[in-house]
A protein has these predicted regions:
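Conserved ABC ATPase signature
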Residues: 177-182, 186
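Conserved ABC transporter NBD signature motif
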Residues: 90-101
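P-loop NTP-binding/switch modules centered on Walker-like glycine-rich loops
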Residues: 68, 82, 108, 204-208, ...
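Conserved ABC ATPase "signature" region
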Residues: 100-101, 141, 154-173, 282-283
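A short, proline-enriched helix->beta-strand linker immediately N-terminal to the Walker B motif
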Residues: 197-201
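Charged, flexible cofactor/metal-binding loops and thiol motifs
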Residues: 26-29, 265-361
Length: 361
């Protein structure tokens, strides 16, 4: 996902209505999303990018959101942050940050929340950083945006502390460098430093390690792991890399055609997935122990057109279980709550109960 470098500072797009949000009592959840739906309208077509998504996150929880390209992962992140641009719009739903529905905030109120209580780390740090400003000035800008009374000298000191916190050596000196003078991994560390500058309750990381080599990827994940514990931050990690999810996350949401089709703990999804799509995704991951079994399997067919969704289950035309089952093509599955050896799971599949008891991977 490539966005302008100053996206976290800009005003949100106008919403249909902007009543003052009612402040709720502090919730046990850092973030609760209820029935969130987002569409993109293009002439006669309406693309349903996010469809009735709900989930909860406690402080320090790490949720991995996985799925094929076009499944709605980045649209979900932008919807939560209030950064959907026309022709897109959030149709409805609640986004409760510490019990406060930020979906009802005005533009000005949302700008005060974004970057302070909820923050974003992008896939490409060069898109997130202004190439003509020093690293120090950009971190200072992020700090004083939410603490305008802070003296510039104190903000610069805080910027150096943040660079040290993300393991950048010679922090004081590196404040005066420009983004092109940093390596890719160090730029990603700077992006993380800016995101945590105001101790957000929730951090959304959209493919933060995709452009990094394996060693740097491991270092960045270790850094995020440490920051989660220090700041008690809940993290939504959006990625194609199932190995990263396995190493870093507590829970996994498998997204397909704009919906969460399976949500559970990491152990369950990786060791014994219930939804056929989750199982198919895992079988596409290279496994040295299965090299002798033949070519790497691929999921047959293509994801559905989100402007012309099929009736019934969206995965049915590609599903090895439901492809020939009339019910799967005619009736959309409801969420099933199933018990697994590693905890509860929520699965949108007509065969969820039967499949939850089977060993598949």
């Amino acid at each position: 996902m490539r966005l302008p470098w100053n996206i976290m500072q800009r005003e949100a797009q106008p919403r249909a209505s902007e009543p003052a949000a009612r402040v709720e009592e502090r919730s046990e959840f850092a973030l609760s999303v209820r029935n969130l739906s987002t569409v993109f309208e293009d002439g006669s077509k309406t693309v349903h990018a996010v469809r009735d998504v709900s989930f909860d996150m406690r402080p320090t929880e790490r949720l991995g959101v996985v799925g094929e390209s076009g499944s709605g992962k980045s649209a979900l992140a932008l919807s939560i942050l209030g950064l959907i641009e026309p022709p897109g719009k959030v149709l409805g739903g609640e986004i409760l940050l510490d019990g406060r529905d930020i979906a009802k905030l005005s533009d000005r109120q949302l700008s005060a929340v974004r970057g302070k209580d909820i923050a974003l780390v992008l896939q490409d740090p060069m898109s997130a950083l202004d190439p003509v400003k020093t690293i120090g000035s950009q971190i200072v800008e992020a700090v004083v945006a939410h603490e305008p009374q802070l003296r510039r000298s104190a903000a610069r000191k805080r910027a150096a502390e943040l660079l040290r916190e993300v393991d950048i050596p010679q922090a004081e000196r590196r404040l005066d460098d420009y983004p092109h003078q940093y390596s890719g991994g160090m730029r990603q560390r700077v992006a993380i430093a800016i995101a945590i500058a105001n101790n957000p309750r929730v951090l959304i990381a959209d493919e933060p390690t995709t452009a990094l080599d394996v060693t740097t990827q491991s270092q960045v994940l270790g850094l995020l792991d440490r920051l989660v514990e220090q700041h008690r931050t809940a993290v939504i990690l959006i990625t194609h890399n199932l190995g990263v999810v396995s190493d870093f996350c507590d829970s996994v949401a498998v997204m397909y055609a704009g919906r969460f089709v399976e949500t559970s703990g990491v152990d369950h999804v990786f060791l014994n997935p219930t939804h056929p799509y989750s199982e198919a995704l895992l079988k596409c991951v290279p496994n040295p122990e299965r090299l002798a079994e033949g070519p790497l399997p691929a999921i047959t067919g293509f994801p559905p057109d989100l402007a012309q969704l099929p009736g019934g289950c969206s995965f049915a035309p590609r599903c090895p279980v439901g492809r020939e089952v009339a019910q799967c093509h005619e009736q959309a599955p409801r969420p099933h709550h199933v018990a697994t050896a590693s905890g509860p799971a929520e699965v949108e599949c007509h065969f969820a109960e039967q499949r939850s008891a089977q060993v598949k991977v």
